Every structure is written in structure tokens, then in C-alpha cells.
Amino acid sequence: GIQLANLYLKNYHDADRVIQSLSGVHTQVVDYLSEQVFMQLSPSVQMFLLQMSVLRKVNLQLLQAVTKHSKTQSIFEEIQQRGLFILAIDEQRYWYRVHHLFREFLENRFKATDLKQYEQAHHRAAYWYKEQGFLMEAIYHAQQAHDQVLVVSLLEAISRELVLDGRVYTLLELVKQLPEQDLSKHLHLLYDTIWVCILTHQNTLANHYIQLWHKVETSNNLILHEDQHGLAPMISLLEDDLPKAYALAQK
């Protein structure tokens, strides 16, 4: 708040009058001062900041991909020189972040004034992270862009890795957010989800996904998986078909 006030008051001589006019809780003061600081900037810098606000952390390559601005580095340096809450988060000064209060103000403004460009910025960020191999960050931005097709594609690509890393509850929470009609089109992801439910002893949920599997399975899709002989008897066991489970386990 103090830094925001300092930036705002640089262009005003009657500082006492302005300070006395401020009232309300801290967040309201921050929003008010953020608005005043923001309005002092050029339109190009304003848009740059709005686009940058969708990012939880930033670097120049990511900013270039999201903003598509020809002078990304010079504008970023200008923002730093103005003291606009850009903080380095590593010793190499490769990654930065925007102070969370200022970023929240910018992101809310961006979403309220131009939802289409807001989602487009997230979409660009999602594809940049995908190309760099940071799939969890890509999923976050794809969710914010409401690109459900990209979300489920990314999740299917990383589901096995999440299972092997022991992040099974992360996978389940993400899967639960998917429409079942999308999940049913991605059998590898559905397969991994069933295994996660089995491993975490969530039998009711496992049976739910098994029923979904049966609805969409038109052929013996289990043969697509190298560990089919482990899953097939477990499915039968959960379905209380013990003779079938025993027979499959012997194969």
C-alpha cells in the first residue's frame, strides 16, 4: 500500500489531501491506489500488464508468447524501473512474479473488461507450457481458458506420470472436474483413473468409472495396456465376480 501510494503521489503536489481522502479496509485502499497507478501508464503498458497478470510466474520467453509484443524486453524493463511490483524468484533472475495484490487487481480488471482476450492469454500460456513440457502448469492455464479439449488431452499425457510419482489424489481431483463425456473419449486416462481408485480403496468411485468404461467399451480395449492382467481381475473383484477374478488372475 505504501509503495502504491508513493507511485500515485509522484504526480501530485497536494499529498496530504489525497491521503486524507483514503478510507476503508486495506484491500479497498490497494485497489484504489492500483487503479490510480494503472491509469498513469500508457495504453500499451496497460495491456502488457493485463496480459502478464494471467501468469503465476513469468520470464521473457513466456511473456513474448503471451503478449505477442515486439518490444517485450524493453517494456518489461520499463515496468521494473517504475517499481511496479515485479519480483525475481530465482538467483539467476530468470523467473519473476508480480506481487499478488497488484496481480489480483490486474487480473480482475482484465477478466471484467475483456474476457475474450483474457482467455486467449491463458490459452497462449497453456501452449507455451505444453511445448516446454510443464504439463501441470499447462493444465492450469487451459482450465482458465475453458479449453476442455486441451485440458483432457494434457491430463491424459501426464496421468501415468502422476500415478508413478504418487500424486494420485491430484489426478483424481483433476479428473473429477472433467465432464464424463470427455473422460469417456480418453480410455487411457479412464484406465489410469480406475487404477487410482483401486489403489486408494475408493471402491464406490472405482465401480462408477468401471460402469463408464463398460458403456464406451466396444472392443477388448484392455489389451491396449501392458498391465491388463492386473487390472482385469481387480475389476472383476470389485464387481463381486470372484470366479472370473480368479480365472483372470491365473492367465
List each language-model region with its residue ranges.
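Generic structural signal for small/hydrophobic residues in well-ordered secondary structure
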Residues: 1-5, 49, 99, 122, ...
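Amphipathic alpha-helical "lid/sensor" segments that cap RecA-like P-loop NTPase cores
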Residues: 1-27, 43-46, 54, 68-69
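C-terminal boundary/linker of central alpha/beta nucleotide-binding cores
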Residues: 27, 31-111, 120-123
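Internal alpha-solenoid helical repeat scaffolds
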Residues: 180-251
